[in-house]
Amino acid sequence: MYLHLHPQNPQPRNIATITETLSSGGVIIYPTDTIYGLGCDIHQHKAIEKVCRIKNIDPRKAQLSFVCYDFSDMSRYVKTMPTPVYRMLRNHLPGPYTFILPASKEVPKLLKSKKDTVGLRIPDNLIARSIVKELGRPILSASLPGEMVEEYTDPEIIYENFGKLVDIVVNGGIGGMVPSTVIDCTGPTAVLVREGAGKWEYEEGTF
């Protein structure tokens, strides 16, 4: 299925169609504030495995992240969040960042790293957040497979390449070419893991 959604005013009917698909174990491709990504309900084990098959990766080694609606939503999946970390996140989210944080018991085992951490996002994208809000649960955030990122900015090309592998491709306009900036907040300091779309000028210091 190929669905058009208005970036600033996503149609509720189409959002409902997407969330119904996710609830039944479906996989989608959807826009974020960076690149288009693969997504599914984080509590649908088989859907996560399907995403990993599409990407040709081992689910237990994938270090997948997921999208939350807001800070209240995010806090359920974080074991501990010291005040300095919370303030730092508030200064950068919603935005093009993935923060690695200590995982709570609410995080499905398949999405936890060996260090019991998880990557979390609150993208500055109304479509992605509307899907999460309507679903009532976070959705997976995984990059599309392959090296040609520039081919994955146009949802029509994405549909041609991946339409048969997923249940829905969401057209939310032309996407970006640069993934999110990844910051590890599990140690005594914030560590830049991957430089991406989000500017990172935070002075590293102890939390």
Regions found by a protein language model. Give the residues of each.
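Active-site-adjacent structural elements in enzyme catalytic cores
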Residues: M1-F207
